[in-house]
Amino acid sequence: MIDQAIAAPLAAALTAKGYETLTAVQQAVLAPEAQGRDVLVSAQTGSGKTVAFGIAIADQILAGQDKLLYADSPLALVIAPTRELALQVARELEWLYASAGAQIATCVGGMDYRSEKRALDRGAHIVVGTPGRLRDHIDRKSLDLSGLRAAVLDEADEMLRMGFIDDVERILQETPDSRQTALFSATMPSAIKRIAK
């Protein structure tokens, strides 16, 4: 039985995908003390963390609605260390948020910049991308994060290891202080804990 605390569109998507129970990391983000708050989660690849952060940010994105309206600027941002992971995350969020009508844009190196800009201009609710390409869109004024409600840092320890932390911090400076932050990392180095604050 899927938890009653999950937003209805997401619960329907999980049920349609055959989910009967949630993983430990997915249950953790539903805990009352985690609702609407910043979360720092130690999670390995394969633990169901993409669905977990999709659930964690749902209240911020949906704001009590079952369907999303047009968004002038993104409501949620997911930063991932690699193009492959970003594309995988986008695919997962697409089915999870499909019945809510979420428009998801992917911004990653090696892809056509103009296509990404068009997707952003059409009103993306969720943007998934890599640090360098996201920063490029910010610098070119094609990505406005002023209305962001939630930010997710996926595999934050990998971003640290790959030297992306300065880009991540610069991206987060463009977002409102009131945003919810969900940070997922297999390990928790001190630099990761600093970003979480």
Question: Where are the regions a protein language model picked out?
Answer:
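Walker A/P-loop NTP-binding motif
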Residues: 27-39, 50-70, 87, 92-96, ...
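The conserved Walker
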Residues: 43-47
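Conserved nucleic-acid-binding Ia/Ib motif block in the N-terminal RecA-like helicase ATPase lobe
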Residues: 3, 9-12, 19, 69-139, ...
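Short hydrophobic/aromatic beta-strand immediately N-terminal to the Walker A/P-loop
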Residues: 40-42, 77, 182
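Conserved pre-motif I regulatory segment
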Residues: 1-42, 154
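Hydrophobic beta-strand core positions in alpha/beta domains
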Residues: 54, 78-80, 128, 161, ...
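Post-DEXD/H (motif II) to motif III coupling segment of the RecA-like Helicase ATP-binding lobe
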Residues: 144-197
